[in-house]
């Protein structure tokens, strides 16, 4: 008896709303832990479910959303213990499934009535069962479908429709004689399950809702794929979409056209994502991809499988959306539920109903931060920070740096120029030189924003078109300085001559400094100056060679040398005189009177 009660309770009689009502008070007071960076937690889903459910019931009172409370485990157990439970009268067969498509199909008679029988009562006689349909025939048809070989001559959807439309087993025999094709190996069939990037939009054609899908890499002559919507959307109600269109929208752009969607169900269909977000406007669904490791599977066809897949597979937990118009992003945000400073939208999958997924738009007002209007911005006190989490706002980064190193006058988040979406880097200008030097010496900072907490590195921000700080362009014919020394003892721009003089002659402790070079949008730290062509470069050996060459040039050249050479020789001669007053280095210990 206990087993039967448990089995009856396992049928889909309780929805997420009923589960939310049964949760304990401690669980309802528990806040999200924040361990997951992008995926919503179970506690968040339970808390959000009551908010979604109440608003849905107030809007349309859909009976499909509310379930029969009498089908709970406690009620079934009490009735079975009293031995007076009538399955045919008490159980609402339509309430066992919250899939609107299935209920519509049962009502129209498109599926066998055997599917609507109560669970665990195979001997129950229901008048609506077709007498010509028995379990053996149904099992035979299912086995025939599963064992059917693939053939490119006939689409699989048409074949399945023909099989389900037939009531006799003789109609299945032509499909069981299909020959297996040799065009693709069997192991490559799962490649079709990989999610693909598509530009989608929900439109109305001939009074029918359809999804227009097209490959973003296709040519202009490629015809789009039209998918009819034979059912209402499982995620966003139509009245909710209409309500968002009635809300006032800003004429100025408020968000980036690129939106992050996190916490997707692992088995969500890409068509469900298309239908949900394509209703707000034309959008590119960009599934992130990562390398696929075969782990020894594939056999002899490993090369074909990996080449057909291009060593990539889609990541199911999140997706990026790139809308054509920024207005669509505003409508999407208006349709979301705002909960604990985050936006959520419901989305369903075959195994999860009304899953709360996070919608994370990027506000354009979070790109820059200014301490005040009167604060000056000096690029010589600017640092570069890479690896910044994309949800981090400029004000959050400024607050983290001020707690560690000092006052910040400006913070700018590096964004994509077209989409205005963060690239994961930032530039920070300090209010004074002391804070700038402390930040360069500290090298790291802990950035905290919402659920993210990351340690990032601080580097000097190298600018282009800067003259040498030592000679002001005199020794390099007024060319721009190619090197920048990021050590806290230097922090200057140098030409080639001044780099050698300041690092190998004037100060011995700077010989191990490494130059920083700006190439395009990137800054590289080189192991040695590029004008030193020796593959076995050593700072100490170059220091001695440079000193000998400068000393010999002073003896060989007279007053007929150029002004640049005289300046270099004068500086090197002065440094030699200063070095002669010091005690030379000796490997053996010095004695008194040496």
Swiss-Prot record:
Keyword Repeat in record: yes
Any Pfam family the entry gives: CEBP_ZZ
GO molecular function: mRNA 3'-UTR binding; mRNA regulatory element binding translation repressor activity; ribosome binding; translation factor activity, RNA binding
Keyword RNA-binding attributed: yes
Assembly: Interacts with fbf-1.
Functional summary from the UniProt entry: Cytoplasmic polyadenylation element binding protein that binds to and regulates the translation of specific mRNAs. Essential for progression through meiosis. Involved in spermatogenesis.
Name this protein carries in UniProt: Cytoplasmic polyadenylation element-binding protein 1
The species this protein was found in: Caenorhabditis remanei (Caenorhabditis vulgaris)
Lineage: Eukaryota, Metazoa, Ecdysozoa, Nematoda, Chromadorea
Gene (UniProt): cpb-1
